A protein has these predicted regions:
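A short beta-loop-alpha structural element at the N-terminal edge
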Residues: 2-14
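Conserved GNAT-fold acetyl-CoA-binding loop/helix
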Residues: 15, 19-41
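Conserved acetyl-CoA-binding loop of GNAT-fold acetyltransferases
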Residues: 19, 134-143
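Conserved beta-hairpin
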Residues: 47-63
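Conserved acyl-donor/pantetheine-binding loop and adjacent beta-alpha core of acyl/acetyltransferases
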Residues: 62-86, 94
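Conserved acetyl-CoA-binding loop-helix of GNAT-fold acetyltransferases
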Residues: 89, 95-108, 131-135
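Conserved GNAT acetyl-CoA-binding A-motif
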Residues: 103, 110-121
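Conserved beta-strand-loop-alpha-helix junction that forms the acyl-donor binding cleft
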Residues: 120-130, 146-150, 157
Length: 158
């Protein structure tokens, strides 16, 4: 398996991946999000990553170009922080532990960038993601209603 930055030529592949997970258990996305705008913004910022297996993109994750939850009071670290979002694994590849490789790849990338902490908002209904983030060492430090859903707010100090 290869974790790497996405290439511009893979925009349609990533969009198809995002569309494929809509409606699957634990996914709170809809047809309007995430879409082409988020993919193009992430590609332009160099913050879209993919997980490749046997030459096929089977997962995607993004470092958010601009943090969306910085103003929330729950965070212990507020400077030099990055968020990740849009974690997706192709439906036929789910329940194989592949989200771990996506999140681990982002953690390694952000450590290289000397990031102080990572923030993530995880949907309250997404039990598998909550378990993964706890297992990987994220602290659950708050809750918030964002983007029409209820989220747990998680932080990892690097």
């Amino acid at each position: 398996m290869i974790f790497r930055k996405a290439e511009a030529s893979e925009a349609e592949t990533v969009l198809a991946l995002y569309r494929a997970v809509i409606g699957t258990p634990f996914c709170v996305w809809d047809a309007s999000y995430p879409g082409e705008t988020e993919i193009q913004d992430d590609l332009a910022a160099g913050t879209l990553y993919v997980l490749e297996r046997n030459g096929e993109v089977i997962g995607a994750i993004s470092i958010v170009p601009e943090n969306e939850t910085d103003d929330l009071d729950c965070w212990k670290v507020k400077e030099n922080v990055r968020e990740f979002a849009r974690v997706a694994v192709r439906p036929d590849c789910q329940q194989q532990g592949l989200s771990f490789y996506l999140v681990d790849g982002i953690i390694r990338e952000l450590k290289k960038q000397h990031t102080a902490a990572i923030h993530i908002a995880v949907a309250k209904s997404n039990i598998p993601a909550q378990k993964l983030y706890r297992k990987m060492g994220f602290d659950f430090c708050g809750e918030a209603d964002l983007f029409g859903n209820h989220y747990f707010l998680c932080e990892m100090i690097l």
